[in-house]
Amino acid sequence: MAQEQPKNNEKSAEKTQTKPVIELLIPLEKYLAAGVHIGTHICTKFMEPFVYRVRNDGLYILDVRKIDERIRIAAKFLSRYEPSKIAAVSVRTYGQKPVVKFCNYVGCKPFTGRFMPGTFTNPSLKWYFEPDIVLLTDPRADSQALKEAAEIGIPIVSLADTDNRTEYIDLIIPANNKGRKSLALIYWLLARQILRERGLLPPDGDLPEPPSEFEVKFKR
């Protein structure tokens, strides 16, 4: 009796392996509504790995899953540091309230508005601060803080849009770092995730305020 041959459609020897899908920190729709994925019409070589696609009008779109992944990584990294030794910086107007709210929750030091030269490098200044790590909103706008952090050799975490160069940055968080809603959501998520990493919030815990409370409001 002839031995039965394996059927052609059998895949016993070659099983398809799929990577487990990690649930996003918030629903995809909330990321999209805040515009965190909206890039610019320019993309540097540094930011190419984080691009999802290019629209017909030439606008680069960031990959939301990579944004989410980097928020998790950055939160885990930042949570290892003494909060009072973390400097969070934003020269950009739309990033200033988010940075202050972030620091209120996390316990780190905010630097908003014009960054005074020598803040990290000149101990003789009355506003001198010696951080162990720096979180920047925009490598271009926050270039003075970036330069000084690199000079003293401390780790640098930074949000970066598609048009940013990222020399000296140790950990990039790809994101729209120009929009009000985007910056509010990113800093809200970072604060929440850091508190979760520290055990100050349960794994599914939320901040007592919504992301909209991190957003810059215009007076009418």
UniProtKB/Swiss-Prot annotation:
Source superkingdom: Archaea
Biological process per Gene Ontology, one example term: translation
Annotated stretches, region: Disordered: 201-220
Gene Ontology CC entries for this record: small ribosomal subunit
Record keywords: Ribonucleoprotein, Ribosomal protein
Coiled coil: none
Pfam families assigned to the protein according to its UniProt record, in alphabetical order: Ribosomal_S2
Matching InterPro entries: Ribosomal_uS2, Ribosomal_uS2_arc, Ribosomal_uS2_CS, Ribosomal_uS2_euk/arc, Ribosomal_uS2_flav_dom_sf
Membership in a protein family: Belongs to the universal ribosomal protein uS2 family.
Protein name, per record: Small ribosomal subunit protein uS2
Gene: rps2
